[in-house]
């Protein structure tokens, strides 16, 4: 039986300069007592803005939780208990991808409304109903599929533009794969991250990711390198966070993400998620013999995304480790079922070496 089309997205998305200090006006829709999660670096940089955003709207003084550890199931369950014990009625996550995954999982287990405030455009997870859980050693554990998307996403483009440039470029890598993975999922009659078929809206959003990167990606990086925001930067941030978030979740994931997650078994792989996805995409496009391969390779070269094992710092990887990565990729049955081109473990190892 054919799958029904299923779409999901955040309850509300707000983007613009200075919005972090104005978040109180939006949070008042969700509750009055927030459990606010961030890491030490975020607190040092943004604490005053965060507090002002609450005080301006007469919200209760938030409960601040500083956490620098991994996003493990045990950790988030304990924080969910703490949020409830402190009588909080909403969860707010402020930070990068890991911190937002933590906030999502805490809100899920505490059964509370959720607001996420990304401080970088390094990945497309903020808008999704997915939290990525890891083991204590940092290796990939599983996707925690949430009952709903975040109720509110607030993106302060001044904050995001000030993030390390490598993070935004990594976000381009994540967004770059969105269209091709959604296209593969649709061709394979696969399931998106909601368990349904990708619909037209999701595929349009996914395609818009690719078009936006081709139009604005290089210019946006140039502007960010000079320390300035611009229309190109605003479009890139929307692409990395919103368009790619909707596109991957409602469009589906395939080989590129399976490879990125497979690489996490290697302690020596220090690549950011989006960088690993970019490499995975190159492998996927080679497998599919996609006509866009050369354009993708040129774009990656211009913005500084990795396309080879050597670029990832894995030029000396052993055959045994490569086989281990291939085994991990094939254990990701959910993503691999959406890959339109058939591949064996042996062929995958060959493609990774040739990329």
Residue ranges and their predicted role:
Residues 1-90, 309:
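ATP/NTP phosphate-donor binding region
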Residues 5-7, 27-29, 84-86, 107, ...:
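Solvent-exposed alpha-helices and their adjacent loops that cap or buttress functional pockets
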Residues 20, 43-47, 73, 98-105, ...:
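Short glycine/serine/threonine-rich phosphate/pyrophosphate-binding segments
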Residues 83-120:
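A short, small-residue-rich loop immediately preceding and capping a beta-strand
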Residues 108-201:
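A glycine/threonine-rich phosphate-anchoring loop and its flanking beta-alpha core
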Residues 193-303, 310:
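Active-site segments that bind and position negatively charged phosphate/pyrophosphate groups
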Residues 290-355:
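C-terminal charged capping/lid subdomain of soluble metabolic enzymes
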């Amino acid at each position: 039986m054919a799958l029904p089309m299923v779409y999901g997205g955040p309850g509300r998305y707000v983007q613009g300069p200075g919005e972090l200090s104005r978040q109180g006006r939006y949070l008042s829709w969700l509750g009055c007592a927030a459990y606010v999660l961030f890491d030490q670096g975020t607190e040092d940089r943004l604490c005053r803005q965060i507090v002002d955003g609450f005080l301006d709207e007469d919200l209760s003084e938030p409960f601040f939780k500083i956490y620098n550890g991994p996003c493990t199931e045990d950790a988030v369950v304990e924080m969910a208990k703490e949020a409830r014990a402190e009588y909080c009625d909403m969860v707010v996550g402020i930070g990068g991808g890991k911190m937002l995954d933590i906030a999502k999982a805490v809100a899920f287990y505490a059964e509370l409304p959720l607001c996420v405030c990304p401080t970088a455009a390094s990945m497309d997870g903020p808008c999704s109903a997915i939290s990525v859980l890891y083991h204590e050693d940092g290796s990939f554990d599983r996707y925690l599929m949430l009952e709903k998307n975040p109720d509110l996403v607030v993106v302060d483009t001044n904050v995001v533009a000030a993030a390390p440039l490598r993070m935004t470029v990594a976000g381009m890598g994540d967004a770059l794969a969105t269209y091709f993975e959604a296209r593969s999922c649709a061709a394979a009659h696969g399931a998106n991250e909601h368990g349904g078929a990708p619909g037209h809206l999701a595929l349009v959003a996914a395609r818009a990711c690719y078009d936006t990167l081709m139009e604005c990606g290089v210019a946006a990086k140039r502007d960010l390198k000079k320390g300035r925001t611009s229309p190109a930067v605003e479009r890139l941030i929307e692409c990395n966070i919103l368009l790619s978030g909707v596109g991957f979740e409602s469009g589906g994931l395939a080989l590129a993400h399976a490879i990125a997650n497979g690489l996490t078994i290697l302690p020596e792989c220090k690549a950011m998620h989006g960088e690993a996805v970019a490499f995975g995409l190159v492998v996927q496009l080679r497998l599919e013999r996609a006509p866009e391969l050369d354009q993708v390779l040129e774009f990656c070269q211009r913005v500084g995304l990795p396309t080879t094992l050597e670029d990832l710092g894995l030029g000396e990887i052993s055959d045994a480790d490569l086989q281990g990565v291939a085994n991990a990729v094939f254990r990701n049955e959910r993503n691999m079922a959406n890959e339109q081109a058939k591949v064996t473990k042996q062929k995958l190892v060959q493609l990774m070496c040739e990329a």
